[in-house]
Amino acid sequence: MDGCIDWSVDLKTYMALAGEPVRVKCALFYSYIRTNYSMAQSTGLRLMWYRNKGDLEEPIIFSEVRMSKEEDAIWFHSAEAQDSGFYTCVLRNSTYCMKVSMSLTVAENESGLCYNSRIRYLEKSEVTKRKEISCPDMDDFKKADQEPDVVWYKECKPKMWRSIIIQKGNALLIQEVQEEDGGNYTCELKYEGKLVRRTTELKVTD
């Protein structure tokens, strides 16, 4: 696309487990320009999406069944490993053109686990410190009028938390971290009949 201002690849990476829904948002509206999708549309700008295939950018045909375009985002209703890659959004009219790419990684669960190590989040804490583990990147799955009903697991198993570990909204608060608190924490949310999971590895140091 000649004459297009190219912001290359945005720093935010999207991650999902196979079978989960995921929304890839056009980063232009969040980090690069001072306008939103509705305002851009009203001034005659068009938003187009492309999938990066090597050096080529192929226009995306939205099937609506598995993938649809919704305002400034692509909704993958049920992401698959083959969806991993780079997606470019282009905002343009006859005199203006700007684009940026977003990275999506979709991975299968590892055998016998509820997560894939490649798409874990990482948190660190020292022993005896207070630590809050959030359930990241869940904003797209929240209903405006209610707190999401999040369930937490450790090493993929339900756990009776000791008294100083408290679930606070969609986060888990460890009021005094112990060495045994290190490990993998998975938060789970039901959305339109599907499960959405995020796993955070907590590393505890002395």
Feature names for model-found ranges:
Residues 11-16, 62-95, 121-125, 161-193:
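Extracellular beta-strand/loop-rich beta-sandwich domains predominantly from IgSF
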Residues 17-23, 27, 107, 125-130:
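Solvent-exposed, conformationally flexible loop/turn segments
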Residues 43, 70, 129, 146, ...:
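Exposed loop/turn and edge beta-strand positions of beta-sandwich/beta-sheet ligand-binding modules
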Residues 4-9, 110-121:
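Proline-enriched interdomain boundary motifs that mark the N-terminal boundary
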Residues 4, 26, 49, 74, ...:
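Disulfide-bonded cysteines in secreted/extracellular proteins and peptides
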Residues 117-138:
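Compositionally biased low-complexity segments at domain edges in trafficked proteins
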Residues 2-5, 25-63, 134-162:
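N-terminal V-set
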Residues 40, 86-110, 144-148, 184-206:
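Extracellular/luminal immunoglobulin-like beta-sandwich modules
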